[in-house]
């Protein structure tokens, strides 16, 4: 089993990719417009979330993941790609017309003030082009991971497709639900 998860074997990770953003600041006053705190942001940290985090953790453990997911054609999608490339995660992210799923947290001191989520339920298109790309990426992988964070990438149809693919090719299948 140890050699299965060594760096020489590729692991296909399919699922919901998310950008997690943490804005750290300090509250110094209440807004005159509404009874809410005004947070002065001092530091911003962006991290990989969802299936992107799963793949990144594999890299940290000296594994070789191949990440497949969807991002929007927006700044958060670009930031996700930049983070993945910086961390050394092989990624094949399809751009679509939905916004990139992101979770932006505002933190003052040790208290999270609010979380702002940008997401739209999407259904991954089971088109022949996408399936051909998945087939090609899975070819050299010994393990398939389905990472479902409930954002729409993982549907019944794609789950069934990947389960049958793993079964028919003798690959190990791991399911990572939220």
Predicted regions mapped to residue ranges:
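Ribokinase/PfkB-type carbohydrate-kinase core domain
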Residues: 1-28, 43-50, 55-178
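Flexible glycine/proline-rich, aromatic-decorated loop/lid segments
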Residues: 30-33
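Divalent-cation-assisted or electrostatically stabilized phosphate/pyrophosphate-binding catalytic cores
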Residues: 35-42
């Amino acid at each position: 089993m140890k050699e299965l998860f060594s760096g020489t074997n590729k692991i296909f990770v399919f699922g919901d990719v998310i950008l997690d953003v943490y804005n750290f600041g300090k509250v110094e006053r209440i807004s005159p417009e509404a009874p809410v705190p005004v947070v002065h942001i001092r530091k911003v940290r962006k991290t990989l979330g969802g299936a992107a985090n799963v793949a990144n953790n594999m890299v940290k453990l000296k594994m070789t993941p191949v990440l497949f997911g969807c991002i929007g054609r927006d700044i958060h999608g670009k930031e996700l790609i930049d983070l993945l490339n910086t961390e050394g995660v092989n990624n094949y992210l399809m751009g679509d017309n939905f916004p990139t799923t992101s979770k932006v947290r505002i933190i003052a001191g040790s208290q999270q003030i609010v979380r702002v989520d940008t997401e739209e339920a999407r259904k991954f298109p089971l088109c022949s082009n996408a399936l051909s790309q998945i087939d090609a990426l899975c070819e050299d992988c010994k393990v398939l991971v389905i990472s479902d964070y409930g954002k729409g990438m993982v549907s019944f149809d794609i789950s069934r497709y990947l389960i049958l693919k793993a079964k028919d090719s003798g690959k190990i299948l791991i399911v990572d639900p939220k």
